[in-house]
Design a protein with these regions (language model features):
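Reductase modules of NAD(P)H-dependent flavoproteins
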Residues: 1-89, 240, 244-346
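Short, surface-exposed secondary-structure boundary micro-motifs
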Residues: 54-57, 94-96, 148, 199
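Short, structured interface segments
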Residues: 78-102, 192-196
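Ferredoxin-reductase
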Residues: 102-193, 247-249, 274-278
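Short, conserved phosphate/pyrophosphate- and ester-handling motifs at nucleotide-, phospho-/glycolipid
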Residues: 140, 221, 315
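A short, basic/flexible loop-to-alpha-helix module at the beginning of a structural domain
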Residues: 198-209
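Histidine-anchored nucleotide/phosphate-binding helix
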Residues: 226-234
Length: 346
């Protein structure tokens, strides 16, 4: 982007200004300058960064009409991750978080090395990387990991609590046809070079909240929730915690010893695994059903005092099922934080 034209972007109603270069999306420009806007997939698929163009000339690159319908486009709605500016522009943010914007961290790239890949279940791996400089992030955020020379980039949430160190951990679900995850059992060996870019994500732990904490996940959604949980513990804050985790069968569960230890050491903590395919498992005495069903039952019986903060991370169908349960339970919209894991496009 050498000698690329530079334009001004004005965000209303927050009154924030920034620069954007031609050929750079508005969202990428915000990341570069440490301005965190609401976002999710960064690929025009999820609608998290939907906004409205008030003034100026723009172009939208390829996006899904599920994220931005033709009717919305006709009324000047845009996706910031797909928006290229060709003049100074003014954008109305339809969704924003003042705390998020004040806690922004500029996105940077890091040279990384794979140090270990450990099996937690038959299809869940714990990936450990070392990076060339400390990465500052908030618990619950994610990075893009690239395998150099392959064109393969995937987004993964950190599982470790943020300590400004040079080691990162990721809980990753392995897919046989996954361009990245299929390499975790031999294709990527310890010592393999990688590129890490981030941090991204708005589903990070909000601090100094006195009310109950709900963590709801499935599959590799454990990764950001594990980070949030341990960051909360490290903070010394005291609040009731319920950790709901959806899996198919008992062999799909992991970290059970760690959860049992936490239940003993924390004053009001419960780990509640939900098995969706436990009908033939006579040895299972825990909750049966999908995680949103178990969450709904629990919220009817578990009486909490104070405003609930809920964090839900995992596959899109799970998130779509969990959200109305939280809403019907009276959890305020600003206290619901979601991270939908959408399929990669590349």
């Amino acid at each position: 982007m050498v000698n690329a034209a530079v334009h001004k972007v004005r965000f209303e109603p927050v009154g924030v200004d920034m620069d954007v270069m031609e050929g750079e999306t508005v969202l990428d420009a915000a990341f570069r300058q440490g301005i965190t806007l609401m976002h999710g997939c960064k690929e025009g698929q999820c609608a998290s960064c939907k906004a409205r163009l008030v003034d100026g000339d723009i172009e939208l690159t390829k996006y899904s009409t599920f994220a931005l319908s033709d009717g919305e486009r006709d009324t000047d709605h845009i996706l910031l991750c797909r928006t290229l500016a060709y003049s100074d522009i003014t954008v109305e943010l339809l969704s924003y978080d003042e705390e998020l914007m004040h806690r922004s961290i500029a996105v940077k790239s890091y040279q990384a090395t794979l140090t270990a890949s450990t099996a937690l279940t038959h299809d869940i791996r714990l990936l450990t990387l070392s990076i060339d400089a400390p990465l500052r992030f908030w618990a619950g955020q994610y990075v893009d990991i690239t395998i150099p020379g392959t064109g393969i980039t995937r987004a993964f949430s950190m599982a470790n609590a943020p300590v400004n160190g040079t080691q990162l951990e990721f809980i990753i679900k392995k897919y046989s046809a996954g361009a990245f995850s299929s390499l975790l059992d031999g294709g990527l060996a310890p010592g393999a070079p990688l590129i890490v870019k981030g941090p991204y994500g708005t589903c990070f732990r909000r601090e100094n909240r006195p009310g109950p904490l709900l963590l709801i996940g499935g599959g590799s959604g454990m990764s950001p929730l594990w980070s949030i949980l341990h960051d909360h513990i490290n903070s010394g804050e005291q609040r009731p915690i319920r950790f709901f985790y959806g899996a198919r069968t008992q062999p799909d569960l992991f970290h059970l010893e760690q959860f049992a230890a936490l239940e003993k050491s924390l004053p009001d903590f419960r780990f509640i695994p939900a098995l969706s395919h436990a009908d033939d498992d006579a040895g299972w005495t825990g909750e049966r059903g999908f995680v949103h069903e178990v969450l709904q039952r629990s919220l009817h019986t578990d009486l909490f005092a104070g405003e609930v903060d809920a964090y839900s991370c995992g596959p899109t169908p799970m998130i779509d099922a969990v959200l109305p349960v939280l809403q019907l339970a009276g959890v305020e919209p600003e206290h619901i934080h979601l991270d939908k894991f959408t399929p990669a496009l590349r």
